[in-house]
Each structure stands twice: as C-alpha cells, then as structure tokens.
Amino acid sequence: MERIGIFVGSFDPFTIGHDSIVRRALPLFDRLVIGVGVNEKKRYMLTAEERVEAIRGLYDGEEKISVEQYSDLTVDFAQRHGAQFIVKGVRSVKDFEFEREQADINRRLTGIETVVFYALPGMDSVSSSVGRELKNFGRDVDSFLPKRIG
C-alpha cells in the first residue's frame, strides 16, 4: 500500500519552517501532497494561485511532491488523495495543544492519523505572519523564507 501524507496550510507565504517539515517528512511517504488552503474569511497577501506556483517552484523535479489548493475540510482533502496521514509542524505548547485537538477530531471523523514534527532549534519564531510583516516593510526575509519564495 502506498503511504500518502498531506501537509496543509495557508502558506501565505511558505516559510523555511514549512520547508523543513516537508523535507523531514518526505522520507516517510511515497507521496506527499501539499494543500494550499483557501478560506473566504481570511485576507491573503498572495493569491492561492501565487502560493501554489511558488511552492511548486520550490520542489520542481521532486516526483514525490504535488501541490494544489483546496477549500474544504482537511480530512476531505486527505480522503480525496487516499492519504492515511496528515503532517503537521509545531513550534510551541500552544501549537501542540491546538494540533492535538485537531488530530483527535480528524481521527474520529475518518480514522486518519496525524504525524507531528517539532520545529528545529532556532525556528520557533519563524512564521508566515512574521515573513509577511518583514516583506511589507522591505526588510530582509532570507532567514524566514526560502530563497525561491522570498
């Protein structure tokens, strides 16, 4: 059976923390689908298409990775792809508590498991919101965003 994981988020923008999770998760799966979430209630710096294309460009040539947008429940997105696992990254206790609760809900709904990766040392302050803020003020974002995205 093919091991399929999904890694989802708004990725506005995709950070070095997100990239770290993808690269660390990749050896565990035969396929990893990156889902770029679209929520009509949120305002974005980048369009969904721009986010998808930026992430695709980052993993160009990586056959195990696909990237697409979605706007439904994460578990429904996972089921569409035949995924058995949802990949999540956590930076703090607050993140962990939220993701633990989401994992329980997802497991109850579909039986899908959640695989958690902890932020590497020094990456706990890396976030899309910090990357956006720095970029808006014209500051250097190299220590927050991958070179091909920043």
Per-segment meaning from a language model:
Residues 1-150:
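Nucleotidyltransferase catalytic core that binds NTPs
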